[in-house]
A protein has these predicted regions:
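Short, well-ordered loop/turn elements at secondary-structure boundaries
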Residues: 77-79, 88, 92-93, 130-132, ...
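Short amphipathic alpha-helix that is part of the acyltransferase structural core
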Residues: 25-70, 81-94
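A short helix-loop-beta-strand connector motif used in the catalytic cores of GNAT acetyltransferases and
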Residues: 72-83, 106
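Conserved N-terminal entry element of GNAT/NAT acetyltransferase domains
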Residues: 2-39
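Residues that line or immediately flank small-molecule/substrate-binding pockets and catalytic motifs
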Residues: 63, 100, 144
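Intrinsically disordered, low-complexity boundary segments flanking structured domains
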Residues: 16-23, 68-69, 120-128
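Short beta->alpha transition motifs characteristic of CBS
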Residues: 96-102
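Acyl-donor binding region in acyl/amide transferases
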Residues: 103-167
Length: 167
């Protein structure tokens, strides 16, 4: 098992969390929702990978790597990362990885390139009629400091803020 990477500096994170990546404020707790990829915010992506690995290991999972980042996070047309940022504490509360059905790419055999592709057979009918109206969500996490069992009132709205970002 690899050691988890050190936290990314708050200055680097703030420099990448620019207005053009901000979706909006949350409905509760005055946090901010951002959408990033490794292409436009590589340091934020590394911090997401670090926080995911910490959260997943604490729940008995994890990749065993220094951070939880895979090919779906780093491919040419990557999954997007929706995160909740606490501007007061200058830290990420949690996040989701997602891909809209309209953004799905296909391999040379015509199969959709999705994190769940190995789990399902997608029929031609599904791909043509339903996939464009879907969203694949995955790798959701709430940082340990904001999990309600550990954080008390600090974590009260963390999950709500994440769902707020999903709409």
């Amino acid at each position: 098992m690899e050691d988890i990477i050190k936290p990314i500096s708050k200055e680097l994170l703030k420099a990448e969390l620019t207005e053009d990546k901000r979706l909006r404020m949350t409905n509760k707790s005055n946090n901010q929702i951002y959408i990033i990829t490794h292409l436009n915010a590589p340091n934020v992506m590394r911090e997401i990978g670090r926080l995911r690995e910490i959260a997943f290991r604490a729940a008995g999972g994890g990749t065993g790597l220094s951070m939880d980042i895979d090919e779906y996070d780093t491919m040419e047309h990557p999954y997007k990362q929706l995160i909740v940022w606490n501007p007061e504490a200058e830290e990420i509360l949690g996040g989701y990885r997602y891909l809209l059905g309209t953004d799905v790419r296909f391999d040379e055999k015509g199969a959709p390139i999705l994190a769940t592709s190995h789990m399902f057979h997608f029929s031609d009918t599904f791909i043509k009629e339903y996939l464009p109206q879907t969203i694949e969500l995955g790798r959701s996490f709430v940082t340990l400091e904001y999990q309600s069992t550990r954080a008390g009132s600090k974590g009260l709205f963390a999950l709500d803020n994440l769902w707020d970002g999903l709409g």
